[in-house]
């Protein structure tokens, strides 16, 4: 059975332990965040993606099958249209405008 774990630290400093268990022969998958199960899937024997929220942050779990082996990845989704990502883009635009304004003044 394959096991992986990651630690996500939120903006407020809260710590979230994300992990998975993936059966080698059955392909059964369990993904958890702290002590809460967020995904259960059966017969995952090919590449697949899963998305779930940690607070208001959309996270992606990637399972990639390559030459009979599985590779696992965890990342924060900063592209999909969510309230958090809209706020992130708005803040970035503001910072760019401020940088350009300061650059023109000096």
Locate each region found by the language model.
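Cysteine-centric segments in proteins
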Residues: 1-106
